[in-house]
Amino acid sequence: MKFGKDFVRQMIPEWQQAYMDYAGLKSILQEIQTSRKRSERPGILKRKLSGSRNFSGLTKRYSRTASTREPEIQDILVHATTGDDGFERYETTILEVAEAGRESELAFFKTLDLEFDKVNHFYRSKVEEMVKEAVVLNKQMDALIAFRIKVERPSSSWSCSETVSVDMNALDSNDQRNTLAEEMGIRVEGNGSNGGDSTKESVPQVLSVLERIRLNKTQETPLSTIKNVLKLSNQEELKFTRENLKKIEERLKNVFIEFYRKLRHLKNYSFLNTLAISKIMKKYDKIASRSAAKPYMEMVDKSYLTSSDEINKLMLRVESTFVEHFAGLNRSKGMNLLRPKVKKEKHRITFSTGFFVGCTVSLVVALVMFIHARNIMGAVGHKVYMETMFPLYSLFAFVVLHMIMYASNIYFWKRYRVNYPFIFGFKEGTELGYRHVLLLSFGLGTLALCAVLINLDMEMDPNTNDYKTMTELLPMFILALVVAILFCPFNIFYRSSRVFFLMVVFRCIAAPLYKVNLPDFFLADQLTSQVQALRSLEFYICYYGWGDFKHRQNTCRSSDVYSTFYFIVAVIPYWSRFLQCVRRLIEENDSSQGYNALKYLLTVVAVCLRTAYSFNRGNIWKISAWVFSALATFYGTYWDIVFDWGLLHRPSKHLLREKLLVPHKAVYYVAIVLNIVLRMAWLQTVLDFNLSFLHRETMIALLAALEIIRRGIWNFFRLENEHLNNVGKFRAFKSVPLPFNYNEEEDRDS
């Protein structure tokens, strides 16, 4: 792989603007090379004619590239100056510039200096942030040590007037002299009988920290939300229990893991940019026939980017502290927790995915041929089948289609370097790849299609009439299996992803009692495109709960309870998004969230009116449903394109946005048109547009499938826009809450 591609591949996506513009510098070098080739062409004949004289030595000259060149001669000088902001800036002067490519060479070094200044400035600012964060972590660990002493020795009573020594060997290791207590400036004395071998410390000084701290509630609950609304304190009094100690240690462990991850990213940032400068200077020397790489790299080696060892020191301190206090002095265990987990692609996943794809395609073909050969659509009872069994099996079709769209999203997010694991907040190394999602989707598809074929075959075979009840229960068995896998407590079938999904679903249901994060409103938006699937779930409860499956009859529509929940189930996803927007409006004071809430409120009204029209076919209901559906559709379409995707901005080029990840602009225009067309398809149920050769349930399923496809398209551009926002703010790390809150005033006084 060429360095340019490898350089881009190893970049931190959110920091890509802060890296060296290697491609831009390379393009300038190509201009220099082109200029030099042009200048050499008129001299080709002259060089040929003078070849024999050169050989005789009569016209011998010493070129700059000759082997006899003096090593002391330099082609460039690099000057370092300090700007008003205190940061160093570098300026390169070319001592001798050839006429050919003069402008390009000057432009090359000017661009190179600007790029290096940018990298150096960014690196220094980030290192300063890390140093400040390390100070905060020192305070947190100071509090942890005091808290641990209090928990480990609850029977002892310490007062500030006493001077008591405690053997710190119970908490810290004597083998590692660079202990946490020493790093944080705690005075440690050796006054044991073993010549100072025992580490002892004045405990009241350490415990005095506890007077200035409170416990932060890092996990939000409905109770904490209510306290915030009532403006009550959301901090806990210190309770010195082993349970609290375990929670604090777990929180600080996560803080250290994230902090170490930042340090690794910064170290990699420094290395990659230094390597990029070295590579581009070697290319310059080769093209321009100069020796500028050595003096320039000497300057780079003296700069803050490569000479600073703050990051290495911090990494060593974090490793030592983490291994000692969070890994039980087991270095291999501690480093395994600190280092990023590389997810390995397994061949059996690819094989299994391909196997189930083949099974699904084969079963679809077999189903079509079976329906055609047995003339099922013209058979007696096919209408009853479409009104009972079809909605049951269509649930799996909706889920499988949505998973396929999500797998496609993951593929294209990875291709265009959208950092979706960071955006969604997945635990490192646990995110599902597109192959895993396809495996699950086609596995479920294969299972559902097998059930459909078995059902139809037994339906048409007179010898299996005694097993009709079992035939009717097939979809229920599949649904029960899916639910059992989803809630399975064992570490199988991607347990971390299942737990994450269920937690986000619960937060969506409990809105607005939880702070709204991107996974919360993203999943709620997915559910708005699965209204028909939710109604199918309601039909499962009605069909099997009330015993209709025994006689294959649908009495659900005649039930007032079913009709009421038919409204409620369709409204739940939109209402959840409405409450999430209200929460963000109050919490963030962002007026755009108010307009977004209005969009979902309009949709709630439209869905209710459309549902009422499906029960009561009257002109008033039809007109009301049509008006509100049209308003919701136009409002939603505008919001999708302008706010969610960030497109159609007038100042931007081509009416899109300033930055686009997909190089082909036509993709964005096609996506806009598709979004509008598929949004309009939502109006069909109000317009009573039906096709004579399609059953009503089939039409509903097709429209629901189109909405799922629209949502899949929306997903890619929504996350692309979110990723570009992170890139603009250089936001590459998640914020991990700290367990302790310091009283700053008391801290300053002390």
Curated annotation (Swiss-Prot):
<comment type="similarity">
    <text>Belongs to the SYG1 (TC 2.A.94) family.</text>
</comment>
<feature type="topological domain" description="Cytoplasmic">
    <location>
        <begin position="1"/>
        <end position="350"/>
    </location>
</feature>
<dbReference type="Pfam" id="PF03124">
    <property type="entry name" value="EXS"/>
</dbReference>
<dbReference type="InterPro" id="IPR004342">
    <property type="entry name" value="EXS_C"/>
</dbReference>
<feature type="topological domain" description="Cytoplasmic">
    <location>
        <begin position="494"/>
        <end position="622"/>
    </location>
</feature>
<feature type="domain" description="EXS">
    <location>
        <begin position="557"/>
        <end position="750"/>
    </location>
</feature>
<feature type="topological domain" description="Extracellular">
    <location>
        <begin position="457"/>
        <end position="472"/>
    </location>
</feature>
<keyword id="KW-0472">Membrane</keyword>
<feature type="domain" description="SPX">
    <location>
        <begin position="1"/>
        <end position="298"/>
    </location>
</feature>
<feature type="topological domain" description="Extracellular">
    <location>
        <begin position="372"/>
        <end position="391"/>
    </location>
</feature>
<feature type="transmembrane region" description="Helical">
    <location>
        <begin position="351"/>
        <end position="371"/>
    </location>
</feature>
<feature type="transmembrane region" description="Helical">
    <location>
        <begin position="623"/>
        <end position="643"/>
    </location>
</feature>
<dbReference type="Pfam" id="PF03105">
    <property type="entry name" value="SPX"/>
</dbReference>
<dbReference type="GO" id="GO:0006817">
    <property type="term" value="P:phosphate ion transport"/>
</dbReference>
<protein>
    <recommendedName>
        <fullName>Phosphate transporter PHO1 homolog 7</fullName>
    </recommendedName>
</protein>
<feature type="topological domain" description="Cytoplasmic">
    <location>
        <begin position="413"/>
        <end position="435"/>
    </location>
</feature>
<keyword id="KW-0813">Transport</keyword>
<feature type="topological domain" description="Extracellular">
    <location>
        <begin position="644"/>
        <end position="666"/>
    </location>
</feature>
<feature type="transmembrane region" description="Helical">
    <location>
        <begin position="667"/>
        <end position="687"/>
    </location>
</feature>
<feature type="transmembrane region" description="Helical">
    <location>
        <begin position="436"/>
        <end position="456"/>
    </location>
</feature>
<keyword id="KW-1003">Cell membrane</keyword>
<feature type="transmembrane region" description="Helical">
    <location>
        <begin position="473"/>
        <end position="493"/>
    </location>
</feature>
<keyword id="KW-0812">Transmembrane</keyword>
<keyword id="KW-1133">Transmembrane helix</keyword>
<dbReference type="InterPro" id="IPR034092">
    <property type="entry name" value="PHO1_SPX"/>
</dbReference>
<feature type="transmembrane region" description="Helical">
    <location>
        <begin position="392"/>
        <end position="412"/>
    </location>
</feature>
<dbReference type="GO" id="GO:0005886">
    <property type="term" value="C:plasma membrane"/>
</dbReference>
<comment type="function">
    <text>May transport inorganic phosphate (Pi).</text>
</comment>
<dbReference type="InterPro" id="IPR004331">
    <property type="entry name" value="SPX_dom"/>
</dbReference>
<keyword id="KW-0592">Phosphate transport</keyword>
<feature type="topological domain" description="Cytoplasmic">
    <location>
        <begin position="688"/>
        <end position="750"/>
    </location>
</feature>
